[in-house]
Amino acid sequence: MPLPYKVNFKLPLEYLSLQDWNNFVQNLIFINQYGTAKLLQYYKNGSFQNLKDVFAKYLYVAQLKVNGYNVLHNLSEPLAYTFGNVFQELANKPSINLPEINVPVSSINYKLPPVEKQIEALIPNLISKISIPINIAGTQFTFSGNSNLAQLTSQYLQSVYLQTWRSITLQNLGNSSVQINNSIYLMPKQCLKITVSNPQEVQISAQSSTLLSELIEFNVIPITAYTITITNSQPDPTPSPFQQLLILNLSNIISSPSQLLNLQFCLDSQCKTPLYSWIESYNSNLSNVYIWINLPISIPANSSITIYMFVRNSIQYPYTGMRPDLTSTYAQYDNGKNVFLIYFNGNEPLSNFNTEGNTIQQISTIGPLGNTINAIYLSGYSNNVGFVYTGKSVPNQPVIVEASAKDMDNQTGGLGADNGQAGIADSTNTAIINAIGVTMGNNSDYFSQDFYINGSETRGYNLQGSAVSQWVYAWVVYQGSSASSWSGCIAPQLYSSNGGYCGTVNNNPLSSSTQLYLAVIGGVGYYDYWQTAWNFMRMRTYPPNGVMPSNTNPQLTTIYVA
């Protein structure tokens, strides 16, 4: 008697289709109906010979229908299974305990338990393969309508899991049945484990809404990453933590500035230690991008470390952020507080400033990039200590303070009032304060340096240039308690004094200080008011001997994520 369907099942079994699976079940019925003689006849002709690869120790199927009839039914734990590449070899053949199955076809009852003995006699060395996955992910969702297994995985989990998936288990937690490829009915409270070559081929439908859970088992996932080598060329290690400046050419890695926030930096290839990063600037073609990262470890002397950069599909804030005026909504993704030792922007709560009687407020103004920003604005003339930022302090250590500031030239005294732009102080008590800072406006000059020692101020060191009402960058370099001098600059740009001025003062007012704060100091009075605004101000660690470690450009690599 010829069979009306193909009986040679494809190997390896991860390519077993739903139709082949249904054929397999019909083969069981055929064996039961026509007996051992026909079975051996077909077996000798090459049919059924890979049944040992289909049968396994855990043959449990919740509901399987062929031609509309239930042909297998077993509600016992564990789950229901289809069969594919989810088995590892076991030395002993399993036992197969199938309950009595009644298939209502023309009132004929097919009793499958005798098949067990025939299969065991035919295949004495049955081997089952059960694979243990490396990773498992799962979720629950309400489902109705039509979809396929790949779409559900991508929608509710991550499509990348399908790159190395081993199996997917569906459990019907609701009260309505779910139909799979018009053959398998996943009844309420039951599970089905699926292993096929292409999850897009597994069509799932439900006429009524029901709650499903999906669990996917998968191995390592290959993803694209970039390595960046950071080299400390100095005979001293970097501090820990350390704010490292990366200068990167990303023109061949990302295509738009909108993707910058999709970057993620990590200390290890598995990204178990993500790094906070702060995008400071970039040019139009992304060939010159400045990004600060906060390294939680020290780079040893004359050594290198490797970090990893990933281009994700979504914004990585708060781990990845950018300076406040780079976004259309001011400071929308500013994470400077996570990157620098101390940081504030124009949205900082005013309660975090001790103004020593001066007036501080938040204003809206045109920023250094030509867009509207928020800024911290200082006015009044009560004290030469303009403010001490009390939101955070750090122990005395070598640091650099940098600020984006503008003398607004809109109060009494104008550009002739000595207005601090950036500085460091050790106290809010003006009677004993020690502080250093760079200023604009002293004698209408572009640059000068002021300092406090034990509450007494000295002003007007290194006067240079002519004051301007423009956004500038001001910085102060403090090399620690043992240093014999300190320096500072004001210029139109960071990291270069071109177009600006710098100076050095040969003393150290902070040598005995225990704490360091962000602050500004100057010289004001009835005829010379504070009138300066700040876009941001930050404090970062001083690099070894003042030399920032260098970095390579990102190098493409493949990372296998467990």
Swiss-Prot record:
InterPro entries reported for this sequence: DUF2341 (IPR018765)
Protein name in UniProt: Uncharacterized protein 562
Source species of the chain: Sulfolobus islandicus rod-shaped virus 1 (SIRV-1)
